[in-house]
């Protein structure tokens, strides 16, 4: 085990932020009030006079430099009390020595100088706050003009969460160094609605999910060079460092390496940052060690020590890495004919194995790769007018129907919902949106899961006439009754929103999944696309090699059960992560009960 082992939480890790040698004091802390400055805190008056005299003669004075680094209220108090100490020294027979008096002259001059430096520091702080306000004003003007369009770019979404969870609190700390009760009061009220650390973690993981699914390198994401993007958005060095640090804290060394390498790339390009290169190398060396690349871990540690020779832990790690390499060399000497493993010597590492067996197929389909829509299959797909099942409304105004897949039969209908209906459905759903859940196969209880990242709500017909209208339309199109169907579910996929491969129907070991409903299994799925998606967001069927892309106003329909009532395992499907855009869908799950005469059983088990 690495001698100087590092815990994943930031408290035991070597600080991942630039830490001032003199951290700012909180003016609200009673320890820094005037009343609590005693002799031990401030030095005695005579000692202060002597220190000031030394400083006036140009000598090094680290203790006074420490005192002048504190924040506004303590610093003014310190300066005043030091000056009182000087006066005390004068009263203590300083006038008897012109030499002492001249020292005081220099001391007073330096006091004025330090006071001006303090004022300049406060003005610089104010200028920094003004610059931030100007930047935020321009940014919010752009974002509020088209919130969904702005957030359609995943980098914008990530940076919004990061700003509210990290940057605004940092600004609060800066403002707290001065009197700003009005701003702090307002910020304190607003902060209860700010994203949390969990939100920032989720946003960062979403970017990494997009990175993996669509094979994007960190440089592409950092530059914001994504397809279909409406707004330019980039990641700074510190943003990239935040991504890498989060991956590190999650034990995800694969992404730690990718993002820390991006940090180094941008630092080498001359970008300004608060993070130091030594800190980046610290994370990177440990991450590549965890990935098994000992030679590179050694090389990175040497680079770290060249920048910070006093880094004790790095020195210990260096000796340990050298020891491990020597052990490996000794072990390979008797078998020199054996080919050395080409393990990541070029700094390229394999993505860790995943819990999802069809991960590669699923993600390939999301990218439009591996779609098995052969010319032979295409010949079996047709477009037609759908008149329903003798429904009078559809005889007068049939729907355009297009085959998306032949077996199992998956069809798309056009102009199913109007723009007005879509907006009304979204308006009804937004106040009710909550983290989408999945049904635990063992307990039947609904719970959140990392493989389903979206928010959803359920709408009843009594909520608005448009809900009843859409329900009736789906009934007319499918020829199935909605009386035993589930409520209309509306889902919104944000940045990196997805639903990994799953079945809509309950399998044999999940017999209690829909027991509470008392309507049997989910016989069919009707999925409405209520938005266009600039990039990503396809509905894919890994076992089929099918990919269906969202198109606003259209809907896709398929049966989950064979006519025998057995589940059709070919319908295992997924909602791909949204790369660019905002994906809105609504779906209706039809159940078995009530469909006996509308979709009767077939003559064989596989019908």
Walk through the language-model features, giving the residues of each:
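Intrinsic-disorder-associated, low-complexity terminal segments enriched in Asp/Asn/His/Tyr and depleted
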Residues: 9, 22, 26-29, 35-38, ...
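Polar low-complexity intrinsically disordered regions enriched in Ser/Thr and small residues
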Residues: 11, 31, 49-52, 59-62, ...
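Fe(II)/2-oxoglutarate oxygenase catalytic core
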Residues: 71-557, 561-607
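Classical eukaryotic N-terminal signal peptides for Sec-dependent ER targeting/secretion
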Residues: 2-7, 41-83, 276
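The N-terminal extracellular segments of secreted preproproteins, especially immediately downstream
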Residues: 21, 31-32, 43, 47, ...
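Small-residue-rich alpha-helical packing segments, especially N-terminal targeting/signal peptides
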Residues: 3-4, 9-22
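Generic short amphipathic/hydrophobic targeting helices enriched at N-termini
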Residues: 10, 14-15, 30, 66-68, ...
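Generic N-terminal simple sequence motifs
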Residues: 17-26, 39, 58, 70
């Amino acid at each position: 085990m690495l001698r100087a082992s590092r815990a994943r939480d930031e408290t035991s890790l070597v600080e991942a932020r630039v830490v001032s040698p003199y951290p700012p004091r909180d003016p609200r802390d009673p320890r820094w009030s005037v009343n609590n400055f005693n002799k031990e805190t401030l030095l005695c008056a005579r000692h202060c006079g002597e220190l000031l005299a030394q400083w006036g003669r140009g000598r090094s004075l680290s203790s006074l430099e420490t005192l002048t680094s504190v924040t506004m209220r303590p610093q003014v108090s310190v300066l005043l009390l030091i000056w009182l100490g000087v006066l005390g020294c004068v009263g203590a027979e300083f006038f008897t020595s012109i030499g002492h008096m001249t020292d005081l002259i220099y001391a007073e001059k330096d006091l004025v100088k330090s006071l001006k430096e303090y004022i300049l520091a406060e003005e610089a702080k104010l200028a920094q706050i003004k610059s931030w306000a100007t930047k935020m004003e321009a940014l919010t003007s752009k974002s509020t003009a088209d919130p969904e369009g702005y957030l359609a770019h995943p980098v914008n979404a990530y940076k919004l969460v990061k700003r509210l969870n990290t940057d605004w609190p940092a600004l609060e700390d800066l403002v707290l160094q001065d009197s700003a009760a009005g701003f702090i009061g307002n910020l304190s009220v607003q902060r209860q609605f700010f994203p949390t650390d969990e939100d920032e973690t989720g946003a960062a993981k979403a970017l990494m999910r997009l990175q993996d699914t669509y094979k994007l390198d960190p440089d592409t994401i950092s530059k914001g060079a994504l397809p279909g993007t409406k707004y330019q958005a980039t990641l700074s060095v510190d943003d990239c460092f935040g991504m890498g640090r989060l991956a590190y804290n999650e034990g995800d060394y694969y992404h730690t390496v990718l993002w820390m390498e991006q940090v180094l790339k941008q630092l080498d390009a001359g970008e300004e940052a608060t993070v130091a290169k030594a800190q980046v190398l610290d994370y990177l060396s440990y991450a590549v060690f965890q990935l098994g690349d000992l030679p590179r871990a050694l090389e990175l540690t040497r680079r770290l020590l060249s920048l910070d020779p006093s880094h004790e832990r790095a020195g210990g790690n260096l000796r340990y890495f050298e020891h491990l390499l020597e052990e490996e060399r000794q072990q390979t000497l008797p078998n020199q004919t054996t080919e050395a493993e080409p393990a990541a010597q070029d700094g390229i590492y394999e993505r860790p194995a995943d819990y999802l067996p069809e991960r590669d197929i699923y993600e390939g389909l999301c990218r439009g790769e591996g779609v098995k829509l052969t010319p032979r299959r295409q010949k079996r797909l047709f477009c037609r007018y759908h008149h329903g099942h003798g429904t009078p409304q559809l005889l007068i105004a049939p729907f355009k129907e297009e085959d998306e897949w032949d077996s199992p039969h998956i069809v798309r209908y056009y102009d199913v919902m109007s723009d007005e209906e879509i907006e009304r459905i979204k308006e009804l759903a937004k106040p009710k949106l909550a983290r989408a859940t999945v049904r635990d196969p063992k307990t039947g209880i609904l719970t959140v899961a990392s493989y389903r990242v979206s928010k959803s709500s359920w709408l009843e017909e009594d909520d608005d006439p448009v809900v009843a209208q859409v329900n009736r339309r789906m009934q007319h199109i499918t020829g199935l009754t909605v009386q035993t169907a589930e409520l209309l579910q509306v889902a919104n996929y944000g940045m990196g929103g997805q639903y990994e491969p799953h079945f809509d129907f309950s399998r044999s070991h999940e017999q209690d999944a829909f027991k509470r409903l008392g309507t049997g299994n989910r016989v069919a799925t009707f999925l409405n696309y209520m938005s266009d998606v600039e990039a990503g967001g396809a509905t894919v069927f890994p076992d089929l090699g099918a990919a269906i892309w969202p198109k606003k106003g259209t809907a896709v329909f398929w049966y989950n059960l064979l006519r025998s009532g057995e589940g059709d395992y070919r319908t295992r499907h997924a909602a791909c992560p949204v790369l660019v855009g905002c994906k809105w869908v609504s779906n209706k799950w039809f159940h078995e009960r009530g469909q006996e005469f509308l979709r009767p059983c077939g003559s064989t088990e596989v019908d």
